[in-house]
A protein has these predicted regions:
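Internal, glycine-rich beta/alpha segment that forms the wall or movable "lid"
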Residues: 80-183, 188, 192-200, 213, ...
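Hydrophobic faces of well-ordered beta-strands that scaffold small-molecule active sites
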Residues: 1-5, 37-39, 69-71, 99-103, ...
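Alpha-helix-loop-beta-strand connector modules within alpha/beta enzyme cores
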Residues: 50-73, 125, 353-366
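Active-site mouth loops of central-metabolism enzymes
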Residues: 5-20, 74-82, 158-168, 306-316
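Acidic (Asp/Glu)-rich catalytic clusters
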Residues: 30-31, 57-65, 88-98, 178-179, ...
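An alpha-helical appendage that flanks or caps ligand/catalytic pockets
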Residues: 120-154, 193-216, 244-333, 364-366
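Conserved, mostly hydrophobic/aromatic
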Residues: 29, 33, 41, 60, ...
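N-terminal beta1-alpha1-beta2 module of alpha/beta enzyme domains
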Residues: 1-68, 162
Length: 366
């Protein structure tokens, strides 16, 4: 069981303060008994104010000693895969294997213009980028002769054997992950039925590929393949550990969910209904398409109601019941809980501590 930190930019919050608070939340999650913590990545918007999940993961790894830390996700469409592999290798080696790299395709946002990677690579190049990333994480040397990357063989220094997790919100990306034997990161924007269907599709695609495994070492663990938080397909064990997914030979899939505990379910739902729209409305509006297409739209109130009804939001007993229900319906045994929903840092830390004390003991044996 882990925590998922979007570094949410609630109105009035300073971005630097939010980032410092995110690192503190991970340290508190370690004290509370969580297995891992996952950090989101966004550019040029208040939805999430961390532009480099891997960089902040390095800070968090330096502040902790046991907890695994992962990216949910590093956006591969705006990064050179070998550069990201080198950064992941540093974090893996220096942390003693506590880092897990989660990657995603991202969305058709203005990021593609700013970083110069372009819409064509976003639309056609994710598979090539992912294969190059996996090669750099699983070999002493790496080279490329593809549509988007071409370079001579070079040594990978430091070498590392890592298997990334792939954020999946679409059937093609589910198939892509399955064919490579890479675990999926499933977003909190879908319910148990959709997650179960995606896991079934993954198994079918994996069997069709002959069980081929092109990733690195087993285990570990999330944009859509978009962000595991808001999960638009327009477009989180710590490092190297088995994620503990249920079912037959599922390779450590991870599911993101909202996690918020209060004395009563009514109070928990009321607090999130009051707080989350203040963040989600301007945050989701910050997604600016690079090519002038209409931006994403969502009924914010209905979305918050869905999150509260679907995920571990409520009394300790209800939170445990929702976690157990998801495990039974999907086979997922590794959930990462978005704990920032109240928009208040002190409440976030209290939420993490209460989840660790009052909920985790009820679900450890699932």
């Amino acid at each position: 069981m882990g925590v998922f930190l979007i570094a949410a930019g609630f109105p009035g919050r300073d971005a630097g303060e939010v980032l410092r608070d995110t690192v503190e939340a991970i340290a508190v999650a370690e004290e509370a008994g969580f297995d891992d913590a996952w950090i989101a990545e966004h550019h040029f918007m208040s939805y999430g104010v961390c532009p480099s999940a891997a960089t902040l993961a390095g800070v968090a790894l330096g502040r902790t000693s046991r907890i695994g830390v992962g990216t949910a996700v590093s956006v591969l469409s705006t990064r050179h895969p070998v550069d990201l592999a080198e950064q992941a290798a540093i974090l893996d080696r220096v942390s003693g294997g506590r880092f897990t790299l989660g990657v995603g395709r991202g969305g058709p946002w203005v990021d593609l213009e700013v970083f110069g990677t372009g819409l064509e690579r976003f639309e056609r190049g994710f598979g090539e980028s992912l294969d190059l990333l996996c090669a750099a994480l699983d070999a002493g040397t790496v080279s490329a002769e593809g549509e988007f990357f071409r370079f001579r063989p070079v040594p990978v220094v430091p070498p590392a054997r890592l298997r990334p997790v792939v954020a999946c919100t679409s059937a093609p990306t589910v198939a892509l992950a399955a064919e490579r034997g890479l675990p999926m990161l499933l977003g909190m924007h879908i319910g148990d039925a959709e997650r179960a269907a995606m896991i079934r599709s993954y198994r079918t695609a994996s069997e069709g590929a002959g069980g081929e495994r092109r990733g690195g070492r087993d285990g570990g663990l999330g944009n859509g393949d978009g962000d595991p938080g808001e999960g638009r397909d327009v477009g989180p064990g710590g490092g190297g550990r088995d994620g503990g997914a249920g079912g037959d030979a599922d390779p450590g899939h991870v599911g993101a969910a909202v996690g918020y505990v209060a004395d009563t379910t009514e109070r928990a739902v009321r607090e999130l209904r009051e707080a989350m729209p203040r963040w989600l409305a301007p945050g989701l509006a910050g997604h600016v398409p690079v090519d002038g297409r209409p931006g994403p739209r969502r009924d914010i109130g209905a979305y918050v109601d869905f999150l509260c009804d679907t995920h571990p939001v409520g009394s300790p007993g209800r939170c445990a019941e929702r976690i157990a229900r998801t495990a039974g319906a999907t086979g997922l045994r590794h959930l990462i809980l978005m704990v920032e929903g109240a928009g208040d840092h002190a409440r976030t830390l209290d939420n993490i501590r209460r989840l660790g004390e009052q909920v985790l003991p009820l679900v450890r044996d699932l």
